[in-house]
Amino acid sequence: MALWTRLRPLLALLALWPPPPARAFVNQHLCGSHLVEALYLVCGERGFFYTPKARREVEGPQVGALELAGGPGAGGLEGPPQKRGIVEQCCASVCSLYQLENYCN
């Protein structure tokens, strides 16, 4: 009985102790609909932008002209050009909340 009366204040203190704060967003792979949902969550009413067609149209003719002229890429040793977009940042690799915010309007 004496042990119980000694442990009661300690148990009450442990019961009232707040839990450690949880991390709201962990760096993770986000692909497809999960990536879109994360953008909606991060950007909210601001919305987000994604214009892949406009980028391809701008880069397409220049790459073809360089290959025909014997410029970089003509020999085929360099491989495909590296892409720098949200899919490469968040799906192929892990991305943070701050990287997602870069795509908000």
UniProtKB/Swiss-Prot annotation:
Organism of derivation: Bos taurus (Bovine)
SUPFAM superfamilies named among the record's database cross-references: Insulin-like (SSF56994)
Pfam families associated with the record: Insulin (PF00049)
Matching Gene3D superfamilies: Insulin-like (1.10.100.10)
Protein's recorded name: Insulin
The keyword Chaperone is annotated on this UniProt entry: no
Localization annotation: Secreted
Function recorded in the entry: Insulin decreases blood glucose concentration. It increases cell permeability to monosaccharides, amino acids and fatty acids. It accelerates glycolysis, the pentose phosphate cycle, and glycogen synthesis in liver.
Propeptide part(s) removed at maturation, as residue ranges: 57-82
Subunit details: Heterodimer of a B chain and an A chain linked by two disulfide bonds.
